[in-house]
Each structure stands twice: as structure tokens, then as C-alpha cells.
Amino acid sequence: MEVVPAEVNSLLPDDIMDTAITLVDEDSIEAVIVSSPIPMETELEEIVSINSTGDSTATPISTEPITVYSNHTNQVAVNTTVSKADSNTTVKPAFPSGLQKLGAQTPVTISANQIILNKVSQTSDLKLGNQTLKPDGQKLILTTLGKSGSPIVLALPHSQLPQAQKVTAQAQPGDAKLPPQQIKVVTIGGRPEVKPAIGVSALTPGSQLINTTTQPSVLQTQQLKTVQIAKKPRTPTSGPVITKLIFAKPINSKAVTGQTTQASPPVVTGRVLSQSAPGTPSKTITISESGVIGSTLNSTTQTPNKIAISPLKSPNKTVKSAVQTITVGGMSTSQFKTIIPLAAAPNVQPIQVPGSKFHYVRLVTATTAGSSAPPVSQSPSVNTQPLQQAKPVVVNTTPVRMSVPFVQAQAVKQVVPKPINSTSQIVTTSQPQQRLIMPATPLPQIQPNLTNLPPGTVLAPAPGTGNVGYAVLPAQYVTQLQQSSYVSIAGNSNFTGTSGIQTQARVSFNGIIPSESASRPRKPCNCTKSLCLKLYCDCFANGEFCNNCNCTNCYNNLEHENERQKAIKACLDRNPEAFKPKIGKGKEGESDRRHSKGCNCKRSGCLKNYCECYEAKIMCSSICKCIGCKNFEESPERKTLMHLADAAEVRVQQQTAAKTKLSSQISDLLTRPTPALNSGGGKLPFTFVTKEVAEATCNCLLAQAEQADKKGKSKAAAERMILEEFGRCLMSVINSAGKAKSDPCAMHC
């Protein structure tokens, strides 16, 4: 090791010389050891100059806060501040008083990559902006683990040298010998290594190179003070202390890499920093004049499998092709990774693979000139492997068709409904037989027109759907069907009539006579969810198709005859007498109908529609088992309800007729030409609004809109102009109608 010259040692303040040098074995060295790597980022926002030969004037140095942070809970806050000093101001770095001394006095062995931390003495005031910092303490050296070969640079303020010593140092740089000094060292790793120390003094900015002393000095064994890093650094009451500072600015995209901070002396842009020591290779850092302030810090730690990201925007910046990271504590395994944000984000293209836990990126060569380090992004939780040449990844480019096979077959098969009396047939694409696929929705135009068929034609059902067939009868046969009179028991009016709603013959099954159901109007059903295929649907229970009903999604019609027959069969399987009339006809000659079995009402008073007697509009008889019956001849409640029921049926018929008439009128309006309604011998004004008049009016409105657009009118003004034009068009139509009414000859000519 080289001895620090006595002149440098004499320049140190007296307040740090409070401990004597004690030589102890190296086994008793106590240090704060950080087992896990501490990723840190550094940046040199402004570059200062250092020269070994120069005049005695002080160099103006800008204020520079430096904070080293860690990703762990115990954060080390290091604030090194160099104030802009005048010629009579002492320049000293500052360090917050958040560290405590621990352990006994032990000798120190200085490792590589050290950060020299000084505190401002009590007499000197450090000005930062409008605030003054007056911390006190002693000088510390923060060291990290690294391999041998890196010298230690001790930067001392040039203003502390007396004038006589400055001249002596400049005249005889190699003969000066300084007594050993006491410097407290903080080691983050605990592995001591012998490193040469190089004394450097501050120089004027006019110097071009940073030269070390020709006679290497040896830093003697000094006293080691171990410190404990607090979780929360204390803030001095004398002024604010920056506890965390990220050196790498994302705006300027500084190329600062590694997990450990490497401190370097202040360097002037455009200058070359050279270090020479016996047995150590020389390293050169060249910083060119560019818009990005900062430089790439290189280390000698051999971690060839880690590549740091250094996107460079300045085309004239020279960087080593392989920039390596720094590992704390000698741990160079790949399980600790660092993610450094890239300024040139488009150079890394992420690849998303469905169902994969790993993240993949595609490396793209940077387009900027002068950048030689490829960008690499690493995941913090995944052990990455060396990336090879990127290959295109194709993930499911073709659509996948998924089918649920009913049987194990190779071909995609379409299963058709299976007939009852035949074996199952599977239609495949290999068969030459063709099948007609009918739509599921009912289409009236596909149904055959029964009125155009000749009399006597038999409509055979589809095979396997049942034995029910239809026969086309002449119109005179339908009119000759027996029609029974409608008997009203509401009063003595003897109202008789027939229904005009039922227009086609009903199909008789299970003993139901079509003339009986067609002889009187039935209340329309209001089914919504039963598809009109349940017994509580009156139309379905009486064997009738729904006609002019208020039901929705009805299947009780010819379009869904297959579903209807299946529902009838299911009902008959449960109850063979389900469709037999509960209210049957009497003997021949009797006008009144009677029960086949009586009702069993308990709370409705037999005045609800679910009472079989009341629904059939007959009175309860002796065979009924009802309780509290009000369905008898002289019951006032029954008379009132029957009148209301009759009125409701009449109202339903009127509404149905009105709907039919309205639909016919609408169809006539759509098919016939322009209506000519006479009003006092002339046409009404709206009859003049023909298709040609409407087109001419629209053209006028569009012309007004274009005119407003050309004049640059506002939206409200344009709307006003269009509405005024529309009013003028309507007035012209009305005037034309008035002239035609006053002159009938012109209308007919």
C-alpha cells in the first residue's frame, strides 16, 4: 500500500483526529455486512474538474446532491453536497448524521470502489439554495466489495491547502510525504482487500488531464468504525437533507448500470481521467460534449453473463461494447436481477404466449448510431437464460373449430330428428342423398294454400309423426255442419247468435264435437310461458287452435303440429280423460247443458273462471261439492259478474275487429295510389304532399344547409334557416290546396 503524504494528512480537520491507530488482527474487524445485493443507480448531473497542477485559486463547484438508495428496508441515505464556493470558502462534502458508531477500534483495510464521505465542520456553513446546513461529525469512507486492481482516489478540496503548501506540492509532487491520518470506513461486504490509494487535489478548470502523484503514496492502516444503518435516516434540524435521489433520469436516459454505486471523482466534460498505479491496468473514461449529461461507469467485476441496458441517444458518445454490472457481497449468481427502464422502449418487443408463466421479449437492434450495447430486459422473479436469436412466434393463427361428437367418428356429422317407426339416420357429406333444411321460425309463405286444392284432397302427415291427417272439404260441407244455439243465462233476453271468428273446420279428436266448440265465442287465452300446450290453456284443453288470442310464443297452431301432438300424448299418458268435456250436452230435446261431474270450490264462491260451472256459464247443481257457492239463479253477485263477463267478451270482439280493420286499412294505404278524399268538392291540403313534392322540399332544405355552410353560419343559425325554408314549402302546399278548392275545374282538368 502507498502512504498518504503528510501534506494531505495535515489538511484534514482536527476534529476527526479523536481516535488513535490501533493495530489488531483482521479477525476482529466488525462491519455491517449486507448479504443480499443492493441495486443502486448513480448519475453525474454536472461534471467538475480535477487537476493536480494549477494555481492556488479556488475552483467554482456547483452544488451536487448525491443519494444512494437501496431496494431493501434499511436504506442508506448518503448526501454528498459540494457548494458553490468563493475563493475564501472551504468546500467540504456533507453526510447526514444518521449513522452510529459500533464496536471497538479495529484496523481498516480499504477495499476497492470506495466513496469518501466528509462532513462539513462546525465552523463552515454549507449553503444549499436559501437554506444553510451545519452538520457535524467525522470523515467516513464507504467501501464495497470488488476485485483487486482499482485504486482508491481521495479527492481533497484545493481550498484547504495553505498557499505555501500549494506551491510546494506543485513544485515537488513526488517528494511530499504526509503522516497517516484517521479515516472512518464503512464496509458493505466484509471482505478486506489491499488497494492502493491515490491522493488527488482539486485543480483549476484550465487543466486538461487528471494526473496522480508520480510517487505513489500508501494509505496506512487506519482505524475502522463500524456503523449501523438505520431504517429511517434522521433529518438534521439545521436544514433539509436529501434522503433519496435517483441518479438515472428517464428524460435524459442516462446509461448508468449495475446494482452498486461506484463513486468517481468529479470529471470535466471532454477530459480524460487516467489512473496509474503499480500493478493495476489503466482505465480511461471519455466523456464527450453532448446534450446528455453523464457518463457510463465501468467496473472490473467479472460478470460476463449479465448485460446492462445502456440506450444512448447521442451519436458521438463512445461506450465500451460490454458494460458489466456490479454485484455486492461477491454474489454473482443469476438469481438476483435488476430491471432498468429503457428510454428507447420500442427496441424491446414483448411476446405474449397464452398459458405461459414466463415473460418473453424480442431483442431489436437499436437504430441510433454509436450505441453498441443491446437492450436487455430481465424479469425480477424468473431465472433468465442467455437469450438467443429471436424467432417469430405464431400462436393459434388459424381459428379452431370445436365440435361435440355424439359418437366417436372421424367426420363431422349432422344429426337429424329421429322418426318413431324407423331406424336412426345420420346424414353425412359423403352421401349423395340431399336433405332440405327448413328454418326453425314459422314462415307463412312456405305453408300450402289449402283454398287452392281441389275438394277431396287428403293431406297425409309426415312419416312417424302420428296418424292424424287432414282432408280438404268443399265450402258447402262446412256450412252444413250442425250449429247449436248460444244460450244466455244472464237474463230472459234469450240472446242467440253464432260466432264469426271461427272460419275453418276444427279437427275432432277424443270425442270432442267441433260444432260445440265453434258454436260460441271462447275467451282468448293469455299464455306467455306454456307455449299454449298445457291444460290450463282453454284453447288447448278444448281441442282448439289459438285464434285471435293474446298469447305469446304460441305452439297451438298448424305450424307446430308436431310439438302439439307430443304434448297431447303426454297429457293423455298422465290422465286418459284429460280432454273429455267436463260440461257435456244433455239428452236430445234438452236445451240446458249439465255437468259430467260437479265443481269442488271452497273459497271463490264459484264465481271465478277456475270454477268449472262458472266457466261453462251454468249454475252449480246438486252433484257439486262446493262450499259458500254463489253461482245460483237469484245470486246478485252472479248476475253482476255475468254481465261484466258478457261486456268483456263484447269488448274483446270489438278490439279484435278494430285491429283487423286497422291492419286492412294500413295495407290498403300501402298498396293503393295517392288517396283522393273529397271535402266539399275539393282536395284536402295533405293530399297534395306527393312523393314529388316531398323530394322537392328536401332539395330546398339541403340547399339552405349548403348555403349556411358556405356563409359560415353557426349551428343554430343554420337550423333556423332550414326551418324557415320548410315553413315556406308548407305554406306553398296549403296555398295550392286552397286554389284547387276554389277552382274545381282546374282540379279535374
From Swiss-Prot:
Keyword Cell cycle attached: yes
The keyword Nucleotidyltransferase is annotated on this UniProt entry: no
Subcellular location(s) of the protein: Nucleus
GO BP terms in the entry: nucleosome organization; regulation of DNA-templated transcription
Binding site for Zn(2+) 5: 599, 613, 620, 624
GO cellular component annotations of the record: nucleus; RNA polymerase II transcription repressor complex
Region (DNA-binding): 523-536, 599-612
UniProt: Zn(2+) 6 binding residues: 606, 620, 626, 629
Record-listed Zn(2+) 1 binding positions: 525, 527, 532, 537
Sites of N6-acetyllysine modification: 244, 249
CRC domain boundaries: 521-634
GO terms, molecular function: metal ion binding; minor groove of adenine-thymine-rich DNA binding; transcription regulatory region nucleic acid binding
Region Linker, residue ranges: 583-596
Source organism superkingdom: Eukaryota
Short name of any one Pfam family annotated for the protein: TCR
Annotated positions binding Zn(2+) 3: 532, 546, 551, 554
Residues reported in the UniProt entry to bind Zn(2+) 4: 599, 601, 606, 611
Record family assignment: Belongs to the lin-54 family.
Function: Component of the DREAM complex, a multiprotein complex that can both act as a transcription activator or repressor depending on the context. In G0 phase, the complex binds to more than 800 promoters and is required for repression of E2F target genes. In S phase, the complex selectively binds to the promoters of G2/M genes whose products are required for mitosis and participates in their cell cycle dependent activation. In the complex, acts as a DNA-binding protein that binds the promoter of CDK1 in a sequence-specific manner.
Subunit structure: Component of the DREAM complex (also named LINC complex) at least composed of E2F4, E2F5, LIN9, LIN37, LIN52, LIN54, MYBL1, MYBL2, RBL1, RBL2, RBBP4, RBL2, TFDP1 and TFDP2. The complex exists in quiescent cells where it represses cell cycle-dependent genes. It dissociates in S phase when LIN9, LIN37, LIN52 and LIN54 form a subcomplex that binds to MYBL2.
Domain notes: The CRC domain mediates DNA-binding. It contains two CXC subdomains (joined by a flexible linker) which are both required for efficient association with target DNA. Each CXC subdomain coordinates three Zn(2+) ions.
The protein's name in its UniProt record: Protein lin-54 homolog
